[in-house]
């Protein structure tokens, strides 16, 4: 729970944190979750596989892998 006096500041901090994250991956996750309940499991798994293939070619993916190997925090660019 967040005190009423801190809601605006906390919401702004959360928005900034999300905006600095892997936004393409967030969008794919949101899409997969929204669509997953209305199709068979095999279709959901195929869609997830395709999403991972797409995301694996992004700049953000390369950034994340390099940062992980260097034990650093990644700086995502949204692509």
Please place each PLM-identified region on the residue numbering.
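Low-complexity, intrinsically disordered Gly/Pro/Thr-rich segments
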Residues: 51-52, 63-66
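C-terminal long alpha-helix characteristic of the crotonase
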Residues: 1-46, 53, 76-79
